[in-house]
Curated annotation (Swiss-Prot):
Matching Pfam families: GCSF
Function: Granulocyte/macrophage colony-stimulating factors are cytokines that act in hematopoiesis by controlling the production, differentiation, and function of 2 related white cell populations of the blood, the granulocytes and the monocytes-macrophages. This CSF induces granulocytes.
Gene Ontology MF: a single term: granulocyte colony-stimulating factor receptor binding
Gene expressing this chain: CSF3
PROSITE patterns, per the entry: INTERLEUKIN_6
Compartments reported by the entry: Secreted
Keyword Secreted among UniProt keywords: yes
Name by which UniProt lists this protein: Granulocyte colony-stimulating factor
Paired cysteines (S-S): C56-C62, C84-C94
Subunit structure: Monomer.
Highest taxon above the source species: Eukaryota
GO cellular component, one term: extracellular space
Glycosylation sites: T153
Range of residues in the leader sequence: 1-20
Length: 194
């Protein structure tokens, strides 16, 4: 009896380890999808950098770290990517978090509408590219049966009551987006490895 119990415990422990083990690079995602995602990350990064540079040049908001407390007061959320970190890289969780994060940034950028006339085209381009990226990920998740039964919903977005808050929010959102994209890029590159 004791031996059977030990065997059962060993088997269940092995099962739990297998379940928790992050997926390796041999994923079921097509290389064309992964390469397109990497291209989209670079495009969104370039758009985000352009927004940051324009906010810095036009409004002297060049250091997002100086605005962190204001970001907390405004309630600017950050998208989690724990399933995409190198310690816990999991394909399904990572794709879902990528999609949810892009969805969050779509909402944050919409909340920044009216930031300033000179920044509107840059903001619009960034929104379009994020939307395209989110759609691409969602379609792939549906194609391989990974899409959640219920798509993500938009949470409460910050309300910017002044032009300064909107511009400072833009600086923080662009900075947070860049950090999000760096993790996303590393995860996607990992999935492209044979």
């Amino acid at each position: 009896k004791l031996m059977a119990l030990q065997l059962l415990l060993w088997h269940s422990a092995l099962w739990m380890v297998q379940e928790a083990t992050p997926l390796g690079p041999t994923s079921s995602l097509p290389q064309s999808f992964l390469l397109k995602c990497l291209e989209q990350v670079r495009k969104v990064q370039a758009d985000g950098t352009a927004l940051q540079e324009r906010l810095c040049a036009a409004h002297k908001l060049c250091h997002p770290e100086e605005l962190v407390l204001l970001g907390h007061a405004l309630g600017i959320p950050q998208a989690p990517l724990s399933s995409c970190s190198s310690q816990a890289l999991q394909l399904t969780g990572c794709l879902r978090q990528l999609h949810s994060g892009l969805f969050l940034y779509q909402g944050l950028l919409q909340a920044l509408a009216g930031i300033s006339p000179e920044l509107a085209p840059t903001l619009d381009m960034l929104q379009l590219d994020i939307t395209d990226f989110a759609i691409n990920i969602w379609q792939q998740m549906e194609d391989v049966g990974m899409a959640p039964a219920v798509p993500p919903t938009q949470g409460t977005m910050p309300t910017f009551t002044s032009a300064f808050q909107r511009r400072a929010g833009g600086t923080l959102v662009a900075s947070n987006l860049q950090s999000f994209l760096e993790v996303a890029y590393r995860a996607l590159r990992h999935f492209t490895k044979p």
